[in-house]
Amino acid sequence: MSVHINAPEGAIAESVLLPGDPLRAKFIAENFLEDVVCYNEVRGMYGFTGTYKGKKISVQGTGMGIPSISIYANELIQSYGVKNLIRVGTCGGYSEKVKVRDLIIAMSASTDSNLNLVRFQGRTFAPTASFELLKPAYDIAVEKGFDPKVGSIYSSDVFYGDDDEDWKKWAKFGCLGVEMEAAALYTIAAKFGVNALALLTVSDHFVTGEVTSAEERQLTFTNMMEVALDTIAKIEN
């Protein structure tokens, strides 16, 4: 048991999917896992464990933003021994290379957060995905015909910014999209020597202005879920 996760020892698998939305965690558990047990409801942040293709897998909601995912990633790793963490979430598209509903595999994550400037005393750390997860995830996505886009993303502390043009700079430097968690997840995974990856579905687009509904974001976008689950099943064979 940890501060924010009310699960007994052994209740959480070594491999965990991390959707930001706890209702997406519930959707994944109900639609993809078998023999499901809900191990956490603290603060409404659902956590479930079940099996997928015979493999024990957990799904834990994290909430939005770097502080929130940092809490859950730290507790999952330190209190429950989790070894593989795959974020399954949404992002805003920055690049014309991606379209709404495309799957992005985040190779690295830039950020405007000060988390690593504080941690590394003003020096820069480059948060990157674990190749041990990235390679099988890419191969699986290609096999499924999902045409994944692999590249860097931007993890922002700000959802409602003051500069409407700021995103163009990040797009110019190759960022495919923006979300709010991956830089922290990759940093924490590196700190503890475990594996992490972010699989993101483009839910809206800064270039085209296209958006998706809250219901669609919660109940669809299943490609990234399938890739994440099959990646875990593959690495645990």
Swiss-Prot record:
Q: Which InterPro entries match?
A: DeoD-type (IPR004402), Nucleoside_phosphorylase_CS (IPR018016), Nucleoside_phosphorylase_d (IPR000845), Nucleoside_phosphorylase_sf (IPR035994)
Q: Return the EC number.
A: 2.4.2.1
Pfam families, per database record: PNP_UDP_1
EC top class named in words: transferase
Please provide, alphabetically and separated by semicolons, the GO molecular function terms listed in this UniProt record. Answer: purine-nucleoside phosphorylase activity
Binding residues annotated for phosphate, in chain numbering? G20, R24, R43, R87, V88, G89, T90
Binding sites annotated in the UniProt record for a purine D-ribonucleoside:
H4, E179, M180, E181, S203, D204
Gene Ontology BP annotations: purine nucleoside catabolic process
| Keywords in alphabetical order | Glycosyltransferase, Transferase
Gene Ontology CC annotations of this record: cytosol
**Subunit relationships:** Homohexamer; trimer of homodimers.
Describe the function of this protein.
Catalyzes the reversible phosphorolytic breakdown of the N-glycosidic bond in the beta-(deoxy)ribonucleoside molecules, with the formation of the corresponding free purine bases and pentose-1-phosphate.
Q: What is this protein called?
A: Purine nucleoside phosphorylase DeoD-type
